[in-house]
Curated annotation (Swiss-Prot):
Induction: By pentobarbital. Expression is negatively regulated by repressor bm3R1 at the transcriptional level. This is Bifunctional cytochrome P450/NADPH--P450 reductase. Changing residue 394 to H: High substrate-free turnover rate constant. Negligible substrate-induced spin-state and substrate-induced heme reduction-potential shifts on addition of saturating concentrations of arachidonate. It comes from the Bacteria. Inhibited by N-(12-imidazolyl-dodecanoyl)-L-leucine. Changing residue 265 to Q: No effective fatty acid oxidation. No effect on electron transport from NADPH to FMN. Nearly wild-type level of high-spin conversion with laurate/dodecanoate, palmitoleate and arachidonate. This protein is a target of protein engineering. Its selectivity-directing and activity-enhancing mutations have been extensively studied and the designed mutations allow this enzyme to act on non-native substrates and/or in order to enhance production of synthetically desirable end-products. Residues 2-472 are annotated as: Cytochrome P450.
């Protein structure tokens, strides 16, 4: 431990550092000081000392809640004058904080978000309607309209109160008073003597503004009490809720403070977020185009559904990147609980204040790279790769923003609708000017919006989500197997999931019961099964699961032996370090102490496709439970499709491209890359790109494949159909939306919408067995449902539903039932093997054609996409799209950065693009860093792809080429990792000097072998352990200097 003195900027006598603060832009002034002084500095003002932190290294430590807790900064103490001990302005040790937190958590669960969705849409539609009615010469004052929108949203969702801001020329009086009060709270920070009589008028206005806010809130409360209304909103929870720990309700004064808190925090930060997001979009047209394309592709209904909003992944990434650059709540304050040393260098005394300067944290180059000022949403493609505590726009731990999911759902919905309905023009070439109060906003930001003339639908009623649920009845022939569904839930998501499971269980003939985990601490039944659904809360069990977890931790093996169970975990990967901690603990501890796990644990992420993951786990779980208890349960969730089919005479009118947001274009060239005499085929295709498409080295071409003629003929033969026959499909289920519903298509065209070669699923097997009239054949099909048989006979052999239908003609499944059970066809992704620096309107791909004897033993297997592409010739049409992979698989910005590229076989594809780019840069006079390409194949006389190009690049000094041949006569098999091992010392030297490392190709054997070789070389060169070498490689990847583009098999 080396103790250091904390840096401090220049002082000015008694005023200390105070004159350095720009009174209008204090946060930006502090950021400038941080740029000069580094990751920590001390800032003194009369009567107080604050230590500002900027690096993830120190902030990670300061976020340890056992050593530091939320501090009420001086600014928050001033806000406390009107927000009292509300959630945001209370100390953690205050009784009302814990009480309110417990009572209000369910109001921000995933289930609650579904209830708020229709109300959010109500306000969002008002915004769209306002902008639709603007004249062509009128502009939009973005922060002002975003403030109207977010205030109206929290008013309606939280308190069923309509501010009607879009029907006012001036802001609502509450907004005027709130903004003025927040300004005054911040301005007090700049005053050396706040009690100076010169500020008496400010004090008078401050008190008047507080009265305006209190009067409105008191009216909202009084009106609700008088009406007797029981809406499922924040206000009802406040008025009726009781703390589950103490049984105490909130008093009226605290309810007032909570409402003011939510009216401020619930709209100020979100309006700033939306304003910044739109600013960054108009300044980055390529990002705007990508986000708008996603909105158009996903939001296909006139009014977005809750599920569609959850599917706006790129829009969510845009919002996160806006929060990274300008987090609208730009700081949070902590204090040391005891004397301690921060970072092993800076001593702190008990009570010392720390301030996390979030915009600086989000610009830590050791985490985010050198391009921290660039707006690049792709940083958030893989949130789990972002180091812990590197991204903190919502605060920390138990004091993090309770409304995070509310804010992000609202912002995603609104931004998605804006992008769907409007094109935006930055007609003033606006330069960013950030206004600071307690939050940040771009001041004076205006744009013009041109309507895309897409009609709006009606606003859904708040009960839409609930009314859409199926009412399940008890099974007619119930087997009554006991099923206890236990839950641990603070926010309601786990409880709702548990009750859903119990509802389904009843329809399947079980005798279900639902209870909290705590109610069965020390009392788990041995009869029947136990399903456990629980969340984690900052790594701790929910309030109604604490006793159970404590009991389980100390329980003996005798207390759980004989219990048959499965666990489903609810979580949120935004809290990566504690994600699934409690569900995993329960599952692993029960198993370790002798309980029997009858279905694998499920894990669902609230920030991703929670429902999709839950449904997938649920399907497998019911199958496993039925197999364990030898039950013949009705699969009422999956097999009863309402898909109807009628034969008609009409041509197909729905292009496949529309389903996937792709474009149709021409093949410019197609040639074979394997040498004559080779038994295999690798095709090089060059694709013409439309003017709106662009790409960079390392991108993928997503291809919409077509099922080949042979497999289509097998389907039509099995069902006795003519491939040219025209049909029309009708269905109501959302899960069938991938089909061309209410359209007229041929049987052949319909079969291009579905996957025909996926392994048969358990759902499909059960459906086939139910339709099989030959008892021995039905037994054979049902036998495949057994866990080991399914693994060995279905998954390992990739046995398909079509193959089984051909084997068992006694299965009387209808063609419509067959189609309804098939998944949507999936795009296949190929690394682009060219550089746009050579031709920006042409891209090439390198395709290994897959064919051979089917693992299932039923004839020949042909890869759908590779064989489709192999048959394309110059002038043929292809449906495809550009996709940027999630990894940092692109050339470094600095051409002098050394490169190490490993790409055997078709894995060389992206590196061909890299080589072309480097050649162009060299011809432009750029100095290039070393570049080493490790390429492997069977033989230089058989499958040396792009041999002439690569050898020419080496002779021109573009790359150093290292080759490995695995099928040379009288020579041992040599793979790329063997050649790398010989160069180990050189490779580690390059990586120590800042080289970037890339792997492309087989991810099942080649990539792990290459990684193992590289880690061994690092350990040998630096004399460190295997664990240290693995950590080094992981850190290399986290820093964006190691990227993989690999696939299985």
């Amino acid at each position: 431990m080396t103790i250091k003195e904390m840096p401090q900027p220049k002082t000015f006598g008694e005023l200390k550092n105070l004159p350095l603060l720009n009174t209008d832009k204090p946060v930006q002034a502090l950021m400038k000081i941080a740029d000069e002084l580094g990751e920590i500095f001390k800032f003194e003002a009369p009567g107080r000392v604050t230590r500002y932190l900027s690096s993830q290294r120190l902030i990670k430590e300061a976020c340890d809640e056992s050593r530091f807790d939320k501090n009420l900064s001086q600014a928050l103490k001033f806000v406390r004058d009107f927000a009292g001990d509300g959630l945001f302005t209370s100390w953690t040790h205050e009784k009302n904080w814990k009480k309110a937190h417990n009572i209000l958590l369910p109001s921000f669960s995933q289930q609650a978000m579904k209830g708020y969705h229709a109300m959010m849409v109500d306000i969002a539609v008002q915004l769209v309607q306002k902008w639709e009615r603007l004249n062509a010469d009128e502009h939009i004052e973005v922060p002002e309209d975003m403030t109207r929108l977010t205030l109206d949203t929290i008013g309606l969702c939280g308190f069923n109160y309509r501010f009607n801001s879009f029907y006012r020329d001036q802001p609502h009086p509450f907004i005027t008073s709130m903004v003025r009060a927040l300004d005054e709270a911040m301005n007090k920070l700049q005053r050396a003597n706040p009690d100076d009589p010169a500020y008496d008028e400010n004090k008078r206005q401050f008190q008047e503004d507080i009265k305006v806010m209190n009067d409105l809130v008191d009216k909202i409360i009084a009106d609700r009490k008088a009406s007797g209304e029981q809406s499922d909103d924040l206000l009802t929870h406040m008025l009726n809720g009781k703390d589950p720990e103490t049984g105490e309700p909130l008093d009226d004064e605290n309810i007032r403070y909570q409402i003011i808190t939510f009216l401020i925090a619930g709209h100020e930060t979100t309006s700033g977020l939306l304003s910044f997001a739109l600013y960054f979009l108009v300044k980055n047209p390529h990002v705007l185009q990508k986000a708008a394309e996603e909105a158009a592709r996903v939001l296909v209904d006139p009014v977005p559904s809750y599920k569609q909003v959850k599917q706006l992944k790129y829009v969510g990434m845009v919002l996160n990147e806006a929060l990274r650059l300008w987090p609208t709540a730009p700081a949070f304050s902590l204090y040391a609980k005891e004397d301690t040393v921060l970072g092993g260098e800076y001593p702190l005394e008990k009570g010392d204040e720390l301030m996390v300067l979030i915009p600086q944290l989000h610009r830590d180059k050791t985490i985010w790279g050198d391009d921290v000022e660039e707006f690049r949403p792709e940083r958030f493609e893989n949130p789990s790769a972002i180091p812990q505590h590197a991204f903190k726009p919502f605060g920390n731990g138990q004091r993090a923003c309770i409304g995070q999911q509310f804010a992000l759902h609202e912002a995603t919905l609104v931004l998605g609708m804006m992008l769907k309905h409007f094109d935006f023009e930055d007609h003033t070439n606006y330069e960013l000017d950030i206004k600071e109060t307690l939050t940040l906003k771009p001041e004076g930001f205006v744009v013009k919006a041109k309507s895309k003339k897409i009609p709006l639908g009606g606003i859904p009623s708040p009960s839409t989500e609930q009314s859409a649920k199926k009412v399940r009845k008890k099974a007619e022939n119930a087997h009554n197997t006991p099923l206890l569904v236990l839950y641990g839930s603070n926010m309601g998501t786990a409880e709702g999931t548990a009750r859903d499971l119990a509802d389904i269980a009843m329809s399947k003939g079980f005798a279900p019961q639902v209870a909290t985990l705590d109610s069965h601490a020390g009392n788990l039944p041995r009869e029947g099964a136990v399903l456990i659904v629980t969340a984690s809360y900052n790594g701790h069990p929910p309030d109604n699961a604490k006793q159970f977890v404590d009991w389980l931790d100390q329980a003996s093996a005798d207390e759980v032996k004989g219990v048959r169970y499965s666990v489903f975990g609810c979580g949120d990967k935004n809290w990566a370090t504690t994600y699934q901690k409690v569900p995993a603990f329960i599952d692993e501890t029960l198993a370790a102490k002798g309980a029997e796990n009858i279905a694998d644990r499920g894990e669902a992420d609230a920030s991703d496709d929670f429902e999709g993951t839950y449904e997938e786990w649920r399907e497998h779980m019911w199958s496993d439970v039925a197999a364990y208890f030898n039950l013949d349960i009705e699969n009422s969730e999956d097999n009863k499709s309402t898909l109807s089919l009628q034969f008609v005479d009409s041509a197909a009118d729905m292009p496949l491209a529309k389903m996937h947001g792709a474009f149709s274009t021409n093949v410019v060239a197609s040639k074979e890359l394997q040498q004559p005499g080779s038994a295999r085929s690798t095709r090089h295709l060059e694709i013409e790109l439309p003017k709106e498409a662009s790409y960079q080295e390392g991108d993928h071409l997503g291809v919409i494949p077509r099922n080949y003629e042979g497999i289509v003929n097998r389907v039509t033969a099995r069902f006795g159909l003519d491939a040219s026959q025209q049909i029309r499909l009708e269905a109501e289920e959302e899960k069938l939306a991938h089909l061309p519903l209410a359209k007229t298509v041929s049987v052949e065209e319909l079969l291009q919408y579905v996957e025909l070669q996926d392994p048969v699923t358990r759902t499909q097997l059960r459906a086939m067995a139910a339709k099989t009239v030959c008892p021995p054949h039905k037994v054979e099909l049902e036998a495949l449902l057994e866990k080991q048989a399914y693994k060995e006979q279905v998954l390992a052999k990739r046995l398909t539903m079509l193959e089984l239908l051909e084997k068992y003609p006694a299965c009387e499944m209808k063609f419509s039932e067959f189609i309804a059970l098939l998944p949507s066809i999936r795009p296949r992704y190929y690394s682009i093997s060219s550089s746009p620096r050579v031709d920006e309107k042409q891209a090439s791909i390198t395709v290994s054609v897959v064919s051979g004897e089917a693992w299932s033993g039923y004839g020949e297997y042909k890869g759908i996409a590779s064989n489709y592409l192999a048959e394309l010739q110059e002038g043929d049409t292809i449906t495809c799209f550009i996709s940027t992979p999630q990894s940092e698989f692109t050339l470094p910005k600095d051409p002098e950065t050394p490169l190490i590229m490993v790409g055997p076989g078709t894995g060389v594809a992206p590196f061909r693009g890299f080589v072309q780019a480097r050649k162009q840069l060299k011809e432009q006079g750029q100095s290039l860093g070393e570049a080493h390409l490790y390429f492997g194949c069977r033989s230089p006389h058989e499958d040396y792809l792009y041999q002439e190009e690569l050898e020419n690049a080496q002779s021109e000094g573009i790359i150093t080429l290292h080759t490995a041949f695995s099928r040379m006569p009288n020579q041992p098999k040599t793979y790329v990792q063997h050649v790398m091992e010989q160069d180990g010392k050189k490779l580690i030297e390059l990586l120590d000097q800042g080289a970037h490392f890339y792997i492309c190709g087989d991810g099942s054997q080649m990539a792990p072998a290459v990684e193992a070789t590289l880690m061994k070389s690092y350990a040998d060169v630096h004399q460190v352990s295997e664990a240290d070498a693995r950590l080094w490689l992981q850190q290399l990847e986290e820093k964006g200097r190691y990227a993989k583009d690999v696939w299985a098999g």
